Amino acid sequence: MAAEDREMMEARGAGESCPTFPKMVPGDSKSEGKPRAYLEAESQKPDSSYDYLEEMEACEDGGCQGPLKSLSPKSCRATKGQAGDGPKPAELPPTPGTERNPEMELEKVRMEFELTRLKYLHEKNQRQRQHEVVMEQLQRERQHEVVMEQLQQEAAPRLFSGGLQNFLLPQNQFAMFLYCFIFIHIIYVTKEMVFFLFAKHYLFCIAAILLCLIKTFWS
């Protein structure tokens, strides 16, 4: 059985990766009514007998057991692609990861810009608040100084007049005793001075008294 299979494969032609395509006869009535795409699809179908024989040969060489499995069309397509008989595979679309990378970079840049802008605004607000606090303190100090100056100007005459009156009024018994002692001492000193002047300079005192009397009566 294996020898017959090998002979059949040699008859088909050694070195072919996929079954040969049937040639189209120009006078074939069946092929005239079918479109070209349909004929090409039929010509690209793998030969089941060839797949079966190839699988048989592989099992004999490898000593596999169990039922034989027919080759998948994917393997046949791969062999066709390697041999250059089949159509070229279409280019794979770009993965979503490669498309998202620029978007993620743009999002990161935008977030960094927003963070820097918010940080700048926060610092600006802090500086403005500090400036406002300092200006309020200076304004309060100036207002306090102005009020104190006004109070001092208003209280200066009152303190002089009221202070003198309060000083002359005795506040307690000791102040009253002090005032009496000073008054008596002033009277005693004045009397002694008058007696001394009349005793030593009586002529001068008499002349002064006469001048005062003449001036008083003359006026």
UniProtKB/Swiss-Prot annotation:
GO cellular component: endoplasmic reticulum; membrane
Chief localisation class: membrane
Biased composition, class Basic and acidic residues, residue ranges: 1-10, 29-45
Pfam families in alphabetical order: TMEM247
Keyword Metal-binding listed: no
Transmembrane annotation, as ranges: 167-187, 194-214
Membrane topology designation: Multi-pass membrane protein
Keyword Endoplasmic reticulum: no
Location of the region described as Disordered in the Swiss-Prot/TrEMBL record: 1-101
Keyword terms of this UniProt record: Coiled coil, Membrane, Transmembrane, Transmembrane helix
Top-level division of the source organism's lineage: Eukaryota
Localization terms from the record: Membrane
Range of residues in the leader sequence: none
InterPro entries tied to this protein: TMEM247 (IPR029200)
Coiled-coil spans in chain: 121-156
Record protein name field: Transmembrane protein 247
Natural source organism: Homo sapiens
Organism ancestry: Eukaryota, Metazoa, Chordata, Craniata, Vertebrata
Gene behind the chain: TMEM247
